[in-house]
Amino acid sequence: MRITVLVLLFVGIAACAWGGNMGSAVAVEIISDSGKTLPLYPVSSRLPNRKAYAEAVKGEHYSINVRNRLNRRVGVVIAVDGRNIISGKKSWLRNSERMYILEPYGEGEFKGWRTGMDKINRFYFTNAADSYATAFNDESAMGVIAVAAYAEVCRYEKSEELSSSRNKSSDHAAPSAKAQAEAAGTGFGREEYSPVHIVEFEPESTAVEKIYLKYEWRATLCGKGIIRCGKFRPERNRMWDDEGFTPYPPVWF
């Protein structure tokens, strides 16, 4: 199945020296406009799916950097909060969706929601209630940046070779309205110039890799025990007062 896809005109960028990236076929980084590469906290590394947490900073604009580590072109379907960043539609990370193309060992910087052939509206971290996805009453994948990488079909491969995959779903209790409002999401930010052009690309039927980054506020990550926050304080010995003397009563006359 040959489809029409978008490719960035400028795909070579320099990544920051510190932080974290995720992936083997493609490497994914989240970089804020301050130049900081968000550190990642992996929770799963089973191929073809990889998952990690990332810390979001409210109000900060960010970009998604993807580097192709393969020796052939790959198409990347990118979804933020469950919405395809090119079409804006609900994404299932399928190979029939709108995607960006990376050349062999090439790199792309994706800064926002595509609203035209030469413009995007920036990504920025905000409350879920202010997110682009919530504007469409879609909170099904809030706080998740997902990247599916599809390698280009090689001409020597047999066309009759098929691979099947079955989507599995499970029911979860919906979060409370308060918790959802306080959760992290991605907004529809300022407009910027970002030209692309259209190319033909035939993706393989199955993604070589899928990467899921769950971004949360620092307080949430602390509460979940993903990161250690504050200084470690050993428990005081109830029979050993460091002062060495009997303290005065709370009220002393």
Indicate residue ranges for each PLM-predicted region.
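Sec-dependent N-terminal signal peptides
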Residues: 3-13
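Intrinsically disordered, low-complexity segments enriched in small/polar residues
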Residues: 16-253
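A detector of low-complexity, intrinsically disordered, Ser/Thr/Gly/Pro/Ala-rich segments
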Residues: 1-2, 244
